[in-house]
């Protein structure tokens, strides 16, 4: 799991490293990634996105208002900041610049924003290399997994490939901060895991998972949890703060 990120970090190490650094080097690399907050304990890689090791769940039938959309998701988000990120509020303040900068297709917005927020809430910090402190702080994560998200049928995307790439620039504590987003959605006939299970993966220090509904609201999206699934639709007006699922067949979820 997270092999792509692990490999990416490892390649940044000096190519002149001796092959004789066997056991000690391997043990050190097991704690390379740290949790996003600088004052938190190191994060073991085995705790990061543990769900990727679990078997995929069967796809549920669609309700009368929402349909299951399934994609193979290949995604990565990286934040590069001169000033360190000290807490969750600072992180969300940086990540929220996408609210005004989203220019992707309307039909895939629920997917893009949900995946984006899932990664943002599970970012890890790249440590200093060989004890040398870098002039910038890098926070990143990503995954490659088949996932299912329930979308209002009036806004359901087509069964085709979608891609969203974005480089955003903002400031953090008066310093430049960049956000690099790469999300690919590939159509598949395979069964997917509920994205709710992904978003609610425990954080390493067991802190409370941010409320998904509150996280989505600034992006003009609304979500309803039903039978362990997220049902997502676009928020059409300022007074449109809830989802009516009364016409959905309870047995179909």
From Swiss-Prot:
Annotated compartments: Virion membrane; Host endomembrane system; Host nucleus membrane
Pfam families: Vesiculo_matrix (PF06326)
Lineage top rank: taxon: Viruses
Membrane topology: Peripheral membrane protein
Species, as recorded: Tibrogargan virus (strain CS132) (TIBV)
Alphabetically ordered keywords of this record: Host membrane, Host nucleus, Host-virus interaction, Membrane, Viral budding, Viral budding via the host ESCRT complexes, Viral matrix protein, Viral release from host cell, Virion
Lineage: Viruses, Riboviria, Orthornavirae, Negarnaviricota, Haploviricotina
Record GO biological process: viral budding via host ESCRT complex
Assembly information from the UniProt record: Homomultimer. Interacts with viral nucleocapsid. Interacts with host TSG101.
Primary role: Plays a major role in assembly and budding of virion, by recruiting cellular partners of the ESCRT complexes that play a key role in releasing the budding particle from the host membrane. Condensates the ribonucleocapsid core during virus assembly.
MF terms (GO), sorted A to Z: structural constituent of virion
GO CC annotations, alphabetized: host cell nuclear membrane; membrane; viral envelope; virion membrane
Full protein name: Matrix protein
Motif PTAP/PSAP motif, residue range(s) on this chain: 55-58
Domain-related comment: Late-budding domains (L domains) are short sequence motifs essential for viral particle budding. They recruit proteins of the host ESCRT machinery (Endosomal Sorting Complex Required for Transport) or ESCRT-associated proteins. M contains a PTAP/PSAP motif, which interacts with the UEV domain of TSG101.
Residues covered by region (Disordered): 1-26
